[in-house]
UniProtKB/Swiss-Prot annotation:
Record's catalysed reaction(s): tRNA(Thr) + L-threonine + ATP = L-threonyl-tRNA(Thr) + AMP + diphosphate + H(+)
Listed CDD domains: TGS_ThrRS, ThrRS_anticodon, ThrRS_core
Protein name per its UniProtKB record: Threonine--tRNA ligase
Cofactor: Zn(2+)
E.C. number: 6.1.1.3
Domain annotation TGS: ranges: 1-61
InterPro entries the UniProt entry points to: aa-tRNA-synt_IIb, aa-tRNA-synth_II, aa-tRNA-synth_II/BPL/LPL, Anticodon-bd, Anticodon-bd_dom_sf, Beta-grasp_dom_sf, TGS, TGS-like
Subunit structure: Homodimer.
């Protein structure tokens, strides 16, 4: 007679074993109708799974985040069901849940077109509208193997052969004539899978290995109701308008080409953005007392072996040979910074030593994963390493946290999610060391008034870390900043300092990044601002336009005044109508558009309007320059107002 304890503490006793669905029905028909699955003693279970002992139960519906994730997973099965009806010869690989949706990898000789995606969407809708029941059957490994062998599903057979023990009892989910294998849980009825949309198709290697066959991956999104689906699709539409690749081309910021995959060709205006971003971070380095250094781009393999990177990152490193020596282009800056630290004897009085670099790094990312500025092979890290004593860890981490928040606030990012990753199962050091280091990070976060989530066991083997994830205007998450303690690398590379008692000690190393990759962060900013950069960051801050040729000399005079005061200004003296010029520079997202005619020339003024069409009226040249320079010095996010 199981006793079921519900989240509110109430208990229900049953004479026989029950399922989550049975308990929901006992509570009321409305809950039974809405029940998707259950969390039994902390573990997700199908609504049909039997509970035969006293248990704690949470009933999951589409209102729960877990419920939405489950229905997305079931939509992947629905996609498989529809696919096999339209292309019976297709072989199904895997269909997991991803952020906001799902995908399925399929082996099919026919290359899918948009018309095929539309046909799949239609068939999925038809199937879901029948509200058919999903039947879960748990059986032996051999039953599952025979089932998929009879259906010619070679990828499912491979998963069984290589990833599932013959002692296990895999769950098969029957969607009418279609059968799929999964850990589950899944919806009990397809009535829950009504609000979905197939989004795109792409190539994907089986198991992510380029030596394997290229499959076709169909992506989809699914939500609990029509309203949520519509909101998401509207957000995607806005994201498409803000796509940094599209805006980058429109504004002539950069380009990429096949001869240098994952490498950026910065154009004049894009490079201006890059340099301004670098200048800003360099000022922050000065405020927080960092040394700026520059390490070599390439180092001998021997050093990477000593640091431990060769064992872990060799496949991602570009290498070359010269004079019988093998070199690797650096994928990260930390080993080089330890080499700089090791030059000359260091005392405890020299610590903390804060070392920063705009390090140009290269990683051999898979070609299929490259994505504009967001995922590249050549990138610049705003990387820093703090060498300190263990007693200094908390204060140094606290300073790093302040620097991260100061920086993000300048760009308007205020929704920051912070996660603390703690000791993994395989790690160096004793528990006492980990207790101290984790406590130091916790105290630093608490001292800065920062709420954080703990990720147990997610730290690196050499130390715990803090991750900073910012959310943009479309509520997308971007993990950028990290503060990572490292108790291993300094020792591996022989870093020591003379302690107060004259003993040789190994410093603690703090890895610190704020933006992460400058290229990626610029991609984020392009999309966050939709190309409308704040005045201080904008490649061109002011454009001055004449109405007739009579004002040409005056335009030159105005532009020169602006340039002398440090404002990035240009002129447009083309023999075009002023309305045409204004429209063109508005599309270029120049913050301020200045028009001069005879009256402005005679009065030594400029007529000012913003790229958003706000007319600020006439101003004296010096007054406008003063206001703009104040905006720039404050790094204001807003334009001048009327």
């Amino acid at each position: 007679m199981p006793v079921i304890t519900l989240p509110d503490g109430s208990k229900r006793e049953f004479a026989n074993p029950v399922s989550t669905l049975d308990v929901a029905a006992d509570i009321g028909p409305g809950l039974a109708k809405a029940c998707i699955a259950g969390r039994v003693n902390g573990e997700l279970k199908d609504a049909c799974d039997i509970i035969d002992t006293d248990s704690e139960l949470s009933i999951i519906t589409a209102k729960d985040e877990e419920g939405v994730e489950i229905l997305r997973h079931s939509c992947a099965h629905l996609l498989g069901h529809a696919f096999k009806q339209l292309w019976p010869e297709a072989k199904m690989a895997i269909g997991p849940v991803i952020d906001n949706g799902f995908y399925y990898d399929i082996d099919l000789d026919h290359k899918l077109t948009q018309e095929d995606i539309d046909a799949l969407q239609k068939r999925m809708t038809q199937l879901a509208k029948t509200n058919y029941k999903v039947e879960k059957r748990v059986g032996s490994w051999q039953v599952a193997r025979d089932t998929f062998e009879a259906r010619g599903e070679t990828y499912k057979m491979e998963v069984l052969d290589e990833n599932i023990s013959k002692d296990d009892q895999p769950a098969l989910y029957h969607h009418e004539e279609y059968v799929d294998m999964c850990r589950g849980p899944h919806v009990p009825n397809m009535k829950f899978c009504q609000n979905f949309k197939l989004m795109s198709v792409a190539g994907a290697y089986w198991r992510g290995n380029s030596d394997n066959k290229m499959l076709q991956r169909v992506y989809g999104t699914a939500w609990a109701d029509k309203k949520a689906l519509k909101v998401h699709l509207n957000r995607l539409e806005e994201a498409a308008k803000r796509d940094h690749r599209k805006i980058g081309k429109q504004l002539d910021l950069y380009h990429m080409q096949e001869e240098a995959p994952g490498m950026v060709f910065w154009h004049n205006d894009g490079w201006s953005l890059f340099l301004e971003l670098e200048k800003f971070i360099r000022q922050k380095l000065g405020q927080y007392t960092y040394q700026e250094v520059k390490g070599p781009l390439m180092m001998d393999r021997v050093l990477w072996e000593r640091s431990g990177h060769w064992d872990k990152y060799a496949d991602a490193m570009f290498t070359t040979n010269s004079e019988n020596r093998e070199y690797a282009i650096k994928p990260m800056n930390c080993p080089g910074h330890v080499q700089i630290f090791n030059q000359g004897l260091k005392s405890y009085r020299d610590l903390p030593l804060r070392m920063a670099e705009f390090g140009c790094c290269h990683r051999n990312e898979p070609s299929g994963s490259l994505h504009g500025l967001m995922r590249v092979r050549g990138f610049t890290q705003d990387d820093a390493h703090v060498f300190c004593t263990e007693d200094q860890v908390q204060q140094e981490v606290s300073a790093c946290i302040k620097m991260v928040y100061d920086t993000y606030e300048t760009f308007g990012f205020k929704d920051i999610v912070v996660k603390l990753s703690t000791r993994p199962e395989k790690r160096i050091g004793d528990d006492d060391m980990w207790d101290r280091s984790e406590e130091a990070l916790k105290q630093a976060l608490t001292a800065n008034g920062i709420a954080y989530e703990i990720l147990p066991g997610e730290g690196a083997f050499y130390g715990p870390k803090i991750e900073f994830t910012l959310h943009d205007c479309l509520d997308r998450a971007w993990q950028c900043g990290t503060v990572q303690l490292d108790y291993a690398l300094p020792g591996r590379l022989g870093a020591t300092y003379v302690a107060e008692d004259n003993s040789r000690q190994t410093p603690v190393m703090i890895h610190r990044a704020i933006l992460g990759s400058l290229e990626r962060f610029l991609g984020i900013l392009i999309e966050e601002y939709a190309g409308k950069f704040p005045t201080w960051l904008a490649p061109m801050q002011v454009v001055v336009m004449n109405i007739t040729d009579k004002q040409s000399d005056y335009v030159d005079e105005v532009v020169n005044i602006f340039k002398e005061s440090g404002i990035r200004a240009s002129k447009d003296l083309r023999n075009e109508k002023i309305g045409f010029k204004i429209r063109e520079h508005t599309l270029r997202r120049v913050p301020y558009l200045l028009v001069v005619g005879d009256q402005e020339m005679d009065n030594k003024e400029v007529a000012v309007r913003t790229r958003d069409g706000v007319d600020l009226g006439k101003m004296r040249i010096e007054d406008f320059a003063s206001k703009i320079n104040e905006q720039i010095s404050l790094r204001s996010l807003n334009l001048l107002e009327d």
